[in-house]
Swiss-Prot record:
Active site: residue positions: D124, D140
Protein name from the UniProt record: Lipoprotein signal peptidase
Keyword set includes 4Fe-4S: no
EC class (word): hydrolase
Main location: membrane
GO MF term set: aspartic-type endopeptidase activity
Domain of life: Bacteria
Source organism: Thermosynechococcus vestitus (strain NIES-2133 / IAM M-273 / BP-1)
Classification of source organism: Bacteria, Bacillati, Cyanobacteriota, Cyanophyceae, Acaryochloridales
GO biological process entries: proteolysis
Annotated pathway: Protein modification; lipoprotein biosynthesis (signal peptide cleavage)
Pfam families: Peptidase_A8 (PF01252)
Length: 158
């Protein structure tokens, strides 16, 4: 008797996307439950002057780019997400770096996209003060990791 195993194509893509999305949603839920959205923002120094948890919202894209662009950004994140899902299902089998890269992009796009559709703005809270960088979130990290993985894959083909 032969046993058939159902194997999902690009399974690492789905795992990475799920992990990125879950990490983003859980950390944002914790921030919203723990901190008040105030002006000036409520902040907790983790390493004073270097890294703080600072609850702010952002109507733009990653790192506050395109501020006040939440209407078109919500649709862009939906289109990107649907495109990545379609690519993973109907496209070719991706190499490991591509699966991680596209999975990170999907998880990040969904994480910030959910915020944009629910509230019109994205929750940000990771505040690295020693480099004077905009406050960001886990979805932003996932998107940037995804870009690095895809660049790596392009520069180091199988």
């Amino acid at each position: 008797m032969s046993s058939r195993h159902f194997k999902i194509k690009n399974s690492l893509f789905w795992w990475v996307a799920g992990l990125a999305l879950a990490s983003d949603r859980l950390t944002k839920a914790w921030i919203v439950a723990t901190y008040a959205l105030t002006v000036p923002p409520q902040t907790t120094p983790i390493i004073p002057g270097v890294f703080h948890i600072t609850y702010v919202t952002n109507t733009g894209a990653a790192f506050s780019l395109f501020a006040n662009g939440s209407i078109w950004l919500r649709w862009l994140s939906l289109i990107v997400s649907l495109g990545l899902i379609t690519w993973a299902i109907l496209g070719p089998r991706l190499d490991r770096w591509q699966q991680v890269g596209y999975g990170c992009l999907l998880g990040g796009a969904l994480g910030n996209g959910i915020d944009r559709f629910l509230t019109g703005e994205v929750v940000d809270f990771l505040d690295f003060r020693w480099i004077q960088f905009p406050v960001f979130n886990v979805a932003d990290i996932a998107i940037n990791i995804g870009i690095v993985c895809l660049l790596w894959s392009a520069w180091h083909p199988r």
